[in-house]
Amino acid sequence: MGRIRNFDRDAVLESAVDVFWERGYDGAGMQEICRVTGLNPGSVYAAFGDKHGLFIEALKSYMTSMSRETIARLNSNPSGRAGIADYYAALIVAMLGGKRRWGCLVTNSIVEFAMNDPQISEAFQLHLARLETALSGAIER
C-alpha cells in the first residue's frame, strides 16, 4: 500500500511555476524545486514522475489559470474593444507591479523548448488556441 500524499498539489504547482518562470526549465535544479515546494525529491518523483512531468503539470496549471483570467477579462465588457483594453491594462499592471517580473512564462518556455517537446508543444497549442478564440470573439464584438 502506497503512502497517502500529504501536500497541496495546487500550491506545489504554483511554487514550481515560480521556479521555472524565474530560472527556466534547464536552470531549475531539483534541489531548488524541492526547497521552494517543500517536497523531498522522492515525493516529487512519486507525484510527477520527474522534473519534466512536474514542469508539464505546472505549465498546464498556469496556462489553464491564465486562460480563464484572460477569457473572463476579454468577455467582461459587452464592447470587445473595451474588453481588450481592460485585458491589456491589467496585463501592464501585473507586469509592472507583480512579483513575477521575468517576462511571459509561455513565451519563455516556447523559446527554451523551441517546440521540440511534443507534450509541451501540444499544451502550448491548446493554450494559444483558447486565447486566439477569446481575442477573435472580442474583436468581432
Residue ranges of predicted features:
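Amphipathic alpha-helical packing segments from all-alpha helical-bundle domains
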Residues: 82-86, 118-141
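Short, basic, alpha-helical segments at the C-terminal edge of helix-turn-helix-like DNA-binding modules
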Residues: 60-66
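Amphipathic alpha-helical segments used for helix-helix packing
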Residues: 83-84, 98-122
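Hydrophobic alpha-helical connector segments
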Residues: 57, 71-101
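Helix-turn-helix
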Residues: 11, 15-53, 57
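N-terminal intrinsically disordered/low-complexity leader segments
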Residues: 1-7
